[in-house]
A protein has these predicted regions:
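Catalytic pocket-lining loop regions of alpha/beta-barrel enzymes
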Residues: 1-101
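Mid-to-C-terminal alpha-helical segments outside catalytic/metal-binding sites
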Residues: 96-100, 106-152
Length: 152
């Protein structure tokens, strides 16, 4: 959970942990993690808007380290997908094996304004370059990473 000013600060130094523990899988999440898809991200801004400048810390970590993944849950994951659709299409293609859908839905029916997950599913379906990539992000990557057996 990367959230500037609160949890796991110094995201720019996270690569040291990834190098030190190459056999441990890490799942990045939250406002600072997803804000840093943008190379010019201002760390104090929790939900940045507008076009993404390529080359952000998160993009580099996902590209360079096989033991890091990205959890798209909550408003921060949703914001990272919706703020620049052109960037998102390429990001989903580049990191199709490293991204994990998470609902962060805190209601019992799985819909409505409090359920960010329903909106995130819609964005993944809309912006994934292919059905294969969509399936990976929505469930196949998590199943593989967490070593879950498919249901019969």
């Amino acid at each position: 959970h990367f959230q500037h000013g609160k949890y796991n600060q110094k995201i720019h130094q996270f690569h040291r942990i990834l190098k030190k523990y190459p056999k441990v899988n890490f799942i990045g999440h939250a406002q600072t993690w997803w804000g840093n898809i943008d190379r010019n991200h201002q760390q104090a801004v929790m939900y940045p808007k507008g076009k993404v400048t390529p080359g952000g810390i998160t993009d580099r970590l996902l590209s360079e380290y096989p033991n890091v993944y990205g959890d798209l849950s909550a408003g921060s994951g949703n914001n990272s997908l919706s703020r620049d659709e052109e960037h998102t299409r390429g990001f989903l293609a580049r990191h199709q094996n490293k991204l994990l859908f998470g609902s962060d839905c805190n209601d019992t029916v799985g819909s409505g304004p409090r359920c960010v997950g329903a909106r995130t599913i819609g964005l993944i379906r809309k912006l994934s370059p292919s059905k294969s990539i969509e399936r990976k992000i929505l469930y196949e990557n998590a199943r593989q990473l967490l070593k879950l057996n498919p249901t019969s």
